[in-house]
Amino acid sequence: MYKFKTKPYKHQEKVFHQSKDERNFALFMEMGTGKTKVAIDTIGYLYQSKKIDAAFIIAPKGVYDNWVHKEIPQHLPDNIPSIVLRWQPNITQTYKKEFLDFIEASGHLKLFVMNIEALSTEKGSETAKWLFRKHPKSMMVVDESTTIKNRKAMRTRNVISLGQLCSYKRILTGSPVTKSPMDLFSQIGFLSDKLLGFTSYYAFQGRYAVVKRRTMGHRSFQEIAGYQRLDELNEKIEAFSSRVLKKDCLDLPDKIFVRRNVPLTDDQKKHYTEMKKLALTLFQDGMLSTTSSVLTQIMRLQQICCGFIKDDDDTIRSINSNRITELVDILNETSGKVIIWASFVHDITAIRDALAKEFGEQSVATYYGQTPQEERQQIVKNFQEDQTTRFFIGQPRTGGFGLTLTAASTVIYYSNSYDLEIRLQSEDRAHRIGQKNNVTYIDLVSPGTIDEKIINALRDKIDIAGQVLGESIESWIV
């Protein structure tokens, strides 16, 4: 009998027993309900049952490191001998040895973790294909499966092709339909084209979409005008999936904290290193002797993590960054209303523009220092009551105190304030009287940067402003 390493919540145990022996299954579990644990327990169970000897986990860049460093060590039982290999595109001598050790290991459950973006490259897809062929008794997990909703994308085609080499398959997402029920075709097609009964996308579209022909100028094309037979589609999906919402999970903690990694781009790394060197020089020259001067340097490092530099004359220069892309990916995985806190006005306007483009102008509201006083109450009212206003993008110094924003049960920190009180107050805009659900807090963090130091201090309830003087200055900058 399989013994859990970490005690599951009731909904996790139910889904585990419902799905553990299924060849193909979809875990449609809202963010914060613990779908990763269910997948890891399934891998462990199938290994102990001698049904698989390897697992291949495909996840977005901001998530796949969590599988390696947090989720697998936390949930995979200690009595299961395992070896974990994380994909990296740069093949060093050390990595070659790790790769060979992984291939040659026997008597171990092998777990290979790869970012989905790598499957858009020839090197990544060929490596994965070679590994999969070496391990036919395997399970493949696609975490945040909306990343393969585009049936024409190279990575989608590669994922579906790789899936045909595996014995067991799982897709994990909190929101399988981001814009259209047509999003389901390739996600479920990865599991098996027999599940929906269609091998042709156009046959699937013809059954569940209303398609009309439009003419613009001399060009004629078909356009989806609506959807049909969705009850039939839902009934089919229920046969091979579990849908779990936070509001139905009565034993979850009131507050759930999630971290999404956003690695720095090469451009950001260059500027970050230069800014660190400058800050260290100022420290060594005795020019960082006040709290405000140290916090200014911390803020400048933060700005680089967010994707911009503010020069001494207040000119703002954008830097190539993945942070907004990661934010949009998260929102595509999330259902319902969302609060997005950002410390810098430049980020608030950039986020607003990106979300308006992705989800529509009416879906976005902003609330920060420059928001006119006479508009503020209406903005909050619209967010609380109007279904079209889905995203509240705010500056925690302005909107983090006193407001009631309980229409959202997901809160994203695009960037964090170093002020503990501001963090705690901004958390409570959603988590207060009137909130009927557990609240999930998602922090965007660039690993190995000031982001990590700030979030660790805030989680430990440390007021950073009181900790950055004296000998500790250097540790904050480095």
Where are the regions that the model predicts?
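Conserved Helicase C-terminal RecA-like lobe
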Residues: 1, 20, 33-34, 38-51, ...
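Conserved pre-motif I regulatory segment
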Residues: 1-28
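Walker B catalytic acidic pair
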Residues: 143-144
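SF2 helicase motor core recognition
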Residues: 120-123, 179-181, 348-352, 376-377, ...
